[in-house]
Amino acid sequence: MAQFFKAKPNSSKQLSAKQSFSVHQLDHLGAGIAQHQGKVVFIPGALPNETVQAQLTEQKKNYARAKLIKVETPSAERVTPLCPHYQSCGGCDLQHMSLAGQREHKSAALVDIMAKFAGAEGNSVPALTGEGWHYRRRARLATLFDKNTKQLSLGFRASSSNQVVPIDSCLVLAKPLADLIAPFAKLLNQLAAKSSLGHVELIDADNGHFAVIRITKPLNDKDMAKLAQFAEQHQIHICLQDNNGEFHGVNGTLLLPVYQLLDDNADATPVSLTFTPGNFVQVNAQINKTMVAQALEWLAPQPGERILDLFCGMGNFSLPLAKLGAEVIGVEGVPEMVSQARENAAANGLSNLTFYHGDLSADLSCEPWMGKIDKLLLDPARAGAFESLQWLKKMKPRQVVYVSCNPASLARDSAVLLERGYKLQKLGLIDMFPQTHHIEAMALFELAK
């Protein structure tokens, strides 16, 4: 293994002293950017047009990092964070910025990254935005059992740490779920097995509210009865996930969460997607609906068109595309998601789509689905779709819609599309995670004639 010299951070007293910095912009991770002795300094928590007091914590050759100590001259975009856990929880790192300011920053950062790293400039479309608070339909809470007090707490991980920050509510979680945290923690503390419980997942679905408890050993009858009683009192569905990954309803019946799409589309009846707590779903239900609607508008699927949906998951885009008449092929790398997608297609009576399991980072030349298509939809994880795009010559889609959760990989992959003769026609922000620095986007590429 190659070894490289790694310089130790400069920890001189002069560098660690508190200093004043003028912040002129944000980086794409939401940290303020200032200049100091010819270096770029990143200051999390600082905003553009602010003068702040900060302490250098890390020195590199071309940049440094600093800890915000005090805001001396605040930005007009600075607001007081509403969450009492803001300083400790690792979740909402832009709560100190107005919602309008957040979105303006994210949109500008997206355009800048695409221009800088892909040389791509497209027609910027209005951002897809929704509620700034109580937008998450799903959250995983860690459990923290204190051996001294014998009490269990629910919470989120601290920033860049495994430490659990106990919470009793959450301002970005759907209101019914946020209101459930405190009574649910009280319930868990009444269980004999409280010291051996794993994480808890809360889900707000179209068919009810769900709580999933990870258990490391079977619960006794008294504990099961307490869970069943709580479920009935609070009108929620509680299920347990065992060490084998299997799910069991506390009342003997397992109900799975469901959400609908196309329920406001005049050209089609709704589709219902069932998922298990282990499946990936977009956590912002409102934005997911508008995101799917925009993808359908851009692709304009027609009966008989062959559309390939790579990284299709359990059919979030595939089923609506098929519902509008296209012949859809969905490919996904997680076998459980493929099985769920097939079940969802069957439950919705859709026979014009086929799902395949496959490694989309591997050689795709011999895959049964590989061949000429009319249109392509990509919705990859943060790593992007670089390997899949190497097979564009065999697929030759006229249009490509790329849904991205990482602007850096989107820019890299956009360069591949541009090299293959595609032109960026539309680019827009998807504000899936308000109050955070996370940037999601949708881009439309068309093959130049």
UniProtKB/Swiss-Prot annotation:
Binding sites annotated in the UniProt record for [4Fe-4S] cluster: C83, C89, C92, C170
Amino acids binding S-adenosyl-L-methionine: Q282, F311, N316, E332, D359, D379
Any single biological process term in GO: rRNA base methylation
Domain TRAM: 12-70
Matches recorded under Gene3D superfamilies: 2.40.50.1070, Nucleic acid-binding proteins (2.40.50.140), Vaccinia Virus protein VP39 (3.40.50.150)
Active site: residue positions: C405 (nucleophile)
Catalytic reaction annotation: uridine(1939) in 23S rRNA + S-adenosyl-L-methionine = 5-methyluridine(1939) in 23S rRNA + S-adenosyl-L-homocysteine + H(+)
EC number: 2.1.1.190
Keyword Transit peptide recorded: no
Single GO molecular function: rRNA (uridine-C5-)-methyltransferase activity
UniProt keyword list: 4Fe-4S, Iron, Iron-sulfur, Metal-binding, Methyltransferase, rRNA processing, S-adenosyl-L-methionine, Transferase
Keyword Magnesium included in the entry's annotation: no
Protein family: Belongs to the class I-like SAM-binding methyltransferase superfamily. RNA M5U methyltransferase family. RlmD subfamily.
Described purpose of this protein according to its UniProt entry: Catalyzes the formation of 5-methyl-uridine at position 1939 (m5U1939) in 23S rRNA.
Full protein name: 23S rRNA (uracil(1939)-C(5))-methyltransferase RlmD
Lineage, uppermost ranks: Bacteria, Pseudomonadati, Pseudomonadota, Gammaproteobacteria, Alteromonadales
